[in-house]
Amino acid sequence: MDAKKLILVGGGGHCKSVIDVAESAGFSILGILDIPENVGKTVLSYPIIGTDDNIPEYVDKALFIVTVGHIKDPNLRIKIHERIETAGGRLATLISGTSHVSKYSSIGEGSVVMHQAVVNADAKIGKGCIINTFANIEHDAVIEDFCHISTGAMINGN
């Protein structure tokens, strides 16, 4: 498997933003998995090639990233992550080329750090997190698994 090939799971608005981050990070997007009625359509010229039922077909071909946003409730994102892991898939971690991530911080698998976000020294980001555009995670902050830090949010250090 080429470590820079990527399958996106979820074809809505958040998917569009993640496409931009994935491209800036040098990933090659093979396609998108979404709901059945969207198969055959495109998102920013990338094809919707199947549904999450097709995850097992791609575990040896690409890494995965969940591109379902759901700010209020992470349960759908958690279920998709679990489905990928159960199938033997690996989750990518995407970091925008325009963000700043301290070498002293840690970012969990399946997380996305969007454009212009800042993750400072000794901050810890869990798995499956969304650190959205212009969010600022200061020193020593801990963001648990599957949290969505919204656009422009500021999380101060200790």
Predicted regions and their residues:
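Short amphipathic alpha-helical segments
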Residues: 19-21, 77-80, 125
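Structural signal for interior beta-strand "rungs" in well-ordered beta-sheet cores
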Residues: 94-157
